[in-house]
C-alpha cells in the first residue's frame, strides 16, 4: 500500500517539476517576445511618426491623385457601368468577368455608411457573407483552442494564443459591422 503511495507521489512530483520547467520556458520565451515586440514597435514608430494621421476623405483624395484620376471621371459612373454590361459574350466567358461585374455592383455604395446601404437583396447578401465568415472564424478559434492542448513548443503556443486573439477581435468587428447593417 505504501509502495503505491510513493509511486503516485513520485509521479505527481515529476509532473509538477515538468510543469514548472515548462512555465519557466514560457516565461523566458514570453520575455523574449515582449522585447522583440518593443524593439519592432519602436522601429515602426520611428518610421511612421513622420506621417500625420489622416481621415478616410484624405486617403480617398490621395488615392485619386495617385492614380491621376480627376473627380469628373467619377461622375461618368453610369456610362462606365453601361459599358461593363454591354461587354461581348467572349469576355463574359473569361474568368475575370464575374469578379469585375460583382465589383462594379458594389462599388457604387462603397462611400456610404453601412447603415445607409439600401435594404434589400444586397444588404441580405452582405449580412449572409459576414455571418458565414464569422462562423468560420469561430470554428478556427475552436480548433486553435483544441490545438493548444497538444503543443510541445512554447513558440507555437505563443503563435496560437496570438492567432486566437486575432480571431476573437475579428469576430467582434464583424459582429459590430453586422449590427450596424441591421
From Swiss-Prot:
Secreted is among the record's keywords: no
GO terms for cellular component: host cell nucleus; virion component
Subcellular location: Virion; Host nucleus
Keywords: Host nucleus, Host-virus interaction, Transport, Virion
One Pfam family from the record: Flu_C_NS2
Role description: Mediates the nuclear export of encapsidated genomic RNAs (ribonucleoproteins, RNPs). Acts as an adapter between viral RNPs complexes and the nuclear export machinery of the cell. Possesses no intrinsic RNA-binding activity, but includes a C-terminal M1-binding domain. This domain is believed to allow recognition of RNPs bound to the protein M1.
Name assigned to this protein: Nuclear export protein
Organism: Influenza C virus (strain C/Ann Arbor/1/1950)
